[in-house]
């Protein structure tokens, strides 16, 4: 199982600089799709339903106060297995071109968010 820090590092390595808000949503969708496609969690870190969408608090504690982020020094891109990279790649390819706001709006329409709030 990957560490959430490795997932964040991998996403930033693939997509480059992005808002911390967008990074949080891409990590969230990576976890969601791992549960669906691979029938197991990608990482064990907790995800919470915050006002602007899902947030992984352990990631937030490292980027708090930043708007844009370009690398994740606490993780390693090589910390993911081939299967984990394939799952994250599919998520990043689909959701990566979307804006942070679009991703946040989408999460607010889905059952996990509605049930958590």
Residue ranges and their predicted role:
Residues 1-117:
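Domain-edge interaction signal
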């Amino acid at each position: 199982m990957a560490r959430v820090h490795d997932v964040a590092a991998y996403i930033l390595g693939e997509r480059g600089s992005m808002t911390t808000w967008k990074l949080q949503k891409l990590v969230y969708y990576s976890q969601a799709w791992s549960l669906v496609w691979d029938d197991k969690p990608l990482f064990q870190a907790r995800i919470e339903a915050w006002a602007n969408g899902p947030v992984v608090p352990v990631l937030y504690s490292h980027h708090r106060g930043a708007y844009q982020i370009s690398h994740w020094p606490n993780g390693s891109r090589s910390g993911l297995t081939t299967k984990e990279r394939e799952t994250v790649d599919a998520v990043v390819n689909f959701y990566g071109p979307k804006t942070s706001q679009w991703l946040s709006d989408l999460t607010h329409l889905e059952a996990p968010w509605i049930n958590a709030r």
